[in-house]
């Protein structure tokens, strides 16, 4: 089982180029191309923030190629990417094809694009069907992901697109295309109030499940912490992945684990992330 991790949390400390290099040096097999800097928005107004980054400039493909080369020079590949979100913001929607382009240019085979939390499977299909021909031209699969909302009165998560196994599968079946697959966010699936558990979702999704966002939580909040640090049952989760013969990467999205790290010690944190991913991979291989 090959392992990967998102690079956004590392890049916030040392930049994207160095982040890819550190992933390789820590022992990951691959890197997950975080494309959020392509378009950052004000979550209140849904309007774009003015911020300069290679991903939102004219030479975005050149930047993607440079990251790919850094990875290859250090022995790792890009396995997948994460498009900017939320997709209900027009500014974000305008960059989704660019996200697919960058994924292909970096060598990734899957681009995770969130559904609109508030829309049905049929409504979200309109966006995905618009993007699929472009994705196919670039040899990139689109993966949708299980989401959540927050109920302030109950102080817990609440239903959103793909939050349950049944709604997730419906999103896939409405489109019914081999280039449209599932990325299961294990942490989201375990949040109280919205999902119905990672194990149930894994078994329901079956062969549709081709990508993962792996992180840890207290089974209440979306903590995005390092695996084995909180309350999730990874033994049961890995067993379920083995049962469906999961063939994708084990990709971490423990994006808050490095919050307290600095440029001086971030590599130590990346190594700890790699160690947690290796433990999960070993558990899978030894089932």
Segments predicted by a language model, with ranges:
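Short glycine-enriched, charge-decorated loop/helix-capping segments at active-site entrances
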Residues: 48-57, 157-158, 224-228
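Aromatic-lined carbohydrate-recognition surfaces of secreted/lumenal glycan-active proteins
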Residues: 143-152, 184
């Amino acid at each position: 089982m090959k392992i990967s991790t998102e690079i956004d949390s590392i890049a916030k400390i040392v930049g994207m180029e160095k982040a890819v290099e550190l992933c390789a040096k820590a022992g990951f097999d691959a890197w997950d191309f975080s494309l959020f800097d392509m378009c950052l928005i004000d979550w209140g107004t849904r309007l774009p923030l003015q911020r300069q980054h290679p991903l939102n400039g004219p030479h975005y493909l050149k930047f993607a190629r440079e990251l790919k080369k850094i990875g290859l020079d250090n022995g790792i590949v890009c396995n997948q990417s994460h498009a900017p979100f939320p997709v209900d913001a027009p500014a974000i929607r305008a960059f989704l094809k660019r996200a697919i382009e960058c994924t292909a240019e970096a060598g990734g085979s899957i681009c995770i694009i969130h559904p609109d939390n508030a829309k049905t499977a049929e409504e979200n299909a309109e966006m995905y069907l618009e993007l699929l021909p472009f994705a196919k031209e670039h040899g990139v699969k689109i993966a949708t992901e299980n989401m959540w909302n927050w109920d302030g009165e109950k102080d817990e998560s609440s239903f959103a697109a793909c939050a349950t196994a049944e709604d997730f599968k419906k999103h896939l079946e409405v489109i019914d295309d081999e280039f449209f697959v599932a990325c299961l966010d294990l942490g989201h699936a375990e949040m109280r109030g919205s999902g119905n558990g990672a194990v149930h979702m894994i078994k329901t999704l079956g062969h549709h499940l081709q990508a993962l966002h792996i992180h840890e939580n207290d089974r209440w909040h979306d903590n995005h912490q390092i695996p084995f640090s909180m309350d999730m049952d990874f033994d049961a989760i890995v067993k379920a992945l083995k049962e469906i013969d999961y063939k994708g990467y084990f990709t971490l999205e423990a994006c808050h684990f490095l919050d307290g790290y600095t440029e001086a010690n971030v590599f130590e944190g990346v190594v700890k992330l790699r160690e947690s991913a290796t433990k999960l991979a070993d558990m899978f291989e030894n089932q």
